[in-house]
């Protein structure tokens, strides 16, 4: 079974080296795609992601992809000869146990695409309760195409409930959050300045998701698996 991994990266220098090093050896090759310039917003100063990724053993491609799905599809093409493509972002982590379960599941998996349930992490030490309903597609056959953001052109289902990711989407400093929301693919879907000032900086704890507030109804203390806690992934 040949498995490759694709990660889209822009301004993810804090997460990227730790993310790449936590990927198990059964993933044959790691590909990091860096869009330059970003999909939205002004170009940021180079944060060194390319060098960091290469030092962690990844192949890096830089290109001015106009949107998220075109960038993801570049990864699909790169791994055309593989059995599976894992499309996981630099702020999405699996525990050792979840990696093992994912490997064993893929040995007999028969669907073209799989999404995963997630712990959505916030600030320093918190997560959404209950978990966000959105399930990102992270496993596909290389023939599957992304059509918009993380949507695909094939049927898909969800991985077994005991396989989850720990998504550090909102586990960032004030500066990191502003850079994220002003450049990512949802930057045109909400008033970023209003949300940043009146939700994020106001330190609200209920109904805080930027595009669908009720998707993160409240925050509770998070308890990471020990191996992820040891990576020091929370912001300072």
PLM feature segments, named:
Residues 2-21, 36-37:
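Active-site beta-to-alpha loop of glycosyltransferases that engages the nucleotide-sugar donor
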Residues 85:
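Short aromatic/hydrophobic "clamp" motif used to bind/position activated sugar donors
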Residues 68-76, 93-236:
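Catalytic-site signature of metal-activated, phosphate-bearing donor transferases
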Residues 35, 88-89:
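Active-site acidic Asp-centered loop
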Residues 62-68:
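Short, acidic/glycine-rich phosphate-metal binding loop used to engage nucleotide
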Residues 1, 80:
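Polar, enzyme-active/binding microenvironments
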Residues 21-62:
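Acidic donor-binding segment of Leloir-type glycosyltransferases
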